Each structure stands twice: as C-alpha cells, then as structure tokens.
Amino acid sequence: MGLDDSCNTGLVLGLGLSPTPNNYNHAIKKSSSTVDHRFIRLDPSLTLSLSGESYKIKTGAGAGDQICRQTSSHSGISSFSSGRVKREREISGGDGEEEAEETTERVVCSRVSDDHDDEEGVSARKKLRLTKQQSALLEDNFKLHSTLNPKQKQALARQLNLRPRQVEVWFQNRRARTKLKQTEVDCEFLKKCCETLTDENRRLQKELQDLKALKLSQPFYMHMPAATLTMCPSCERLGGGGVGGDTTAVDEETAKGAFSIVTKPRFYNPFTNPSAAC
C-alpha cells in the first residue's frame, strides 16, 4: 500500500442494503465482464470498519467503489428518513394533543354558554312582569281575536314594547285559561243536570212501585151491572094493563124479541085442609 492508500483509510458506519461477501467477491472478480449489478442479492447489514479493509478493495475496482457509494447513500437516506418520520410523529402527536385540548376547551365553552343561556332564559321568564296597561291592552285584543297572525303579533309587540314570542306565549296561556274555565262551567252544568235527572228517576221509581202495589191489591172478579127485565105484553095485561077495558096493540116483532116468562097461576083454597073445618 502506498501513501495515498494510507491517507484514504478511516472508519465507516454503514446502514443499508449491502451484498454478502461471497456475492461481492464474485462481482469483483467478474468486473471486467458485462454484469448487471441490479441482480446482485442485497442483504441488510450494519458494519463499522476501516474503509477498504473489510471488503479488500483493490486499486482499479470501480465496481466495489460504486457499491460502497450506493451503500453509504442508502444508509444516509434511511437515517434521514427515520429521523424525519420520528419528527413527523412527534409533530403529529403534538398536534393531536393540541387538537384534543382545543376540542375539550370548545366543549367546555359550549357547555358554559348553554348553561349561561339557560340561566338567561330562566331569568328572563322570571323577570317578565306586565303592567296594568299592557295587561288591559292584551285582554282587549284577546276579546277581539283569540289568535293572532304574524303581522298582528308584530304590531302588538311593538305597541307593548315586548318581543313577539312573549306576546305569542301570553295568548297561548290565555287560551288555555279560557278553555279551563269553560270546562269548569260545563262540568258544573252537567253536575246539575245529573242531579235533576237523578231526582226525576227516583220519583218515577216511586210511582212505579205504587202502581205495582195497587195492582196487587185489586180483586180477581169484576162488578157486573144490574140486569134489566122486560115483560111480555100478556104479562103486562095480567099485571093490570087491561084496567078500564083498554087494550094496547103490540107489534109482532117486539113481542117476538122480548124475553117472556110463563108462570102457572096458583090459587090458595083454604078448605082443602080437613083440620080447617073444625
């Protein structure tokens, strides 16, 4: 080895793909022939040695110098890429943490704002107090119109210095109260009607019981009117119709249709009894 060779010695740390020693020596021996170095099998390796000594590089071995340069370039690129990936991971991890913190802050802020809005809504509902003039005007408008269209609602809200939503809620509550009062009135009326019908039903039940008792107390026979007797013309003559020698002419149809009773005359003889002569 000459002076130039001693000056070129140094430590080399390589990380990358390098050929195995057998393939490398075989490639150096056949450097003069046309060999495509792309087909040389490359294995991952990590070496720390003097430059030129581990591979026994000779002068004029251009192929060996080219492979060493490729190995060092591969190791530099891999180290740079690994460092860049690590930095990207660190940056991405930091960004993820920052995004998570920002999301948490947004959620907390939204919850706080919602709670604040709810408190404001409750306080607004509690603070709403109508004056006598506003109440009177609302009552007058309700008597005219129980429901309002959007234009009427806007005009009334401007007149009362209120929001349209407040006017709408007041009208809704007023309609509900009116309906409740009407329901109570109807309920009282129906109660009175029910009481009246109950009394009438009780009275009718009593009358029905009285009629049933009267029907049971009546006798089972019926009273017949007294029969009228008619006399035939001969009976009338015997009874004294021929006094004075006057005779009455009787129609044949009347004599035939009349009810006649024929009786034998009975004469009492006081001398028929022998004890009577004594």
UniProtKB/Swiss-Prot annotation:
Coiled-coil region: none
DNA-binding region(s) from the entry: 123-182
Sequence positions bearing Phosphoserine: 92
GO cellular component, one term: nucleus
Nucleus in keyword set: yes
GO biological process, one term: response to cytokinin
Keyword terms, alphabetized: DNA-binding, Homeobox, Nucleus, Phosphoprotein, Transcription, Transcription regulation
Region described as Disordered: spans on this chain: 68-103
InterPro entries named in the record: HD, HD-ZIP_Homeobox_LZ_Class_II, Homeobox_CS, Homeodomain-like_sf, Leu_zip_homeo
Annotated GO MF terms: DNA-binding transcription factor activity; DNA-binding transcription factor activity, RNA polymerase II-specific; transcription cis-regulatory region binding
Source organism superkingdom: Eukaryota
Main subcellular location of this protein, as a coarse class: nucleus
Biased composition regions of type Low complexity, renumbered to the chain: 72-82
Region (Leucine-zipper) location: 190-211
Cellular compartments annotated: Nucleus
Alphabetical list of CDD domains matching this protein: homeodomain
Family: Belongs to the HD-ZIP homeobox family. Class II subfamily.
Function: Probable transcription factor.
Name of the featured protein: Homeobox-leucine zipper protein HAT22
Organism: Arabidopsis thaliana
